[in-house]
Amino acid sequence: MEKRKDSLRIIAQALSSYRAEEMFISFNGGKDCTVLLDLIHQANLKDAKKIKCIYVRPLNPFSEIEEFVDRCRQHYGITIATVDGGIKAALEQICRADPQLKACIMGSRRSDPYCERLASFQETDPGWPRLMRINPLLEWTCEDIWSYIREHNVPYCALYDRGYTSIGDRTNTIPNPHLKVEADSSGEEVTYLPAYTLQDADKYERAGRL
């Protein structure tokens, strides 16, 4: 997969520009940053596995996400630190706790909000903690993400099998209505297809966000 090679080149470039101790992976338990974590840990790159991983926990997290973060700790044999709060406040806290940090590796994709013009290497905006944002997955589509997950048996949160396609927290996320299986006259409970079955996914991925 050419996009995978491009992503690994970006990660390699990051490791040539910064020491592993100067970078961290921003992790939220979602599919995109899980693919990012897997790429970094499967890559045969010097010091790649030394890059710290930080779980930015929202105010009202799904228990399934919490469980999945623990599963990733075990699956990859890594320490995942936890920082609570919104992303800006979390980054401020992270940088105060470890002033040597200079770069944040993220799972952002071009179809994500405010990412249309994002570059693979781009500094944070004014008013934010000063970091280089590194975006190895920028050109991946939602279909690319799911193809990689299924081809490489990458673990993912159970919510995705229940129709959730873009996961925030319990106050702003519902199953994607485009995956709803209508109940028949028997009165059976409404169900949802898995996230990886969503058609035109880059367009409808966030339809379950409130």
Role assignments for model-derived ranges:
Residues 1-210:
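Nucleotide-activated chemistry modules centered on ATP-dependent adenylation/adenylyltransferase
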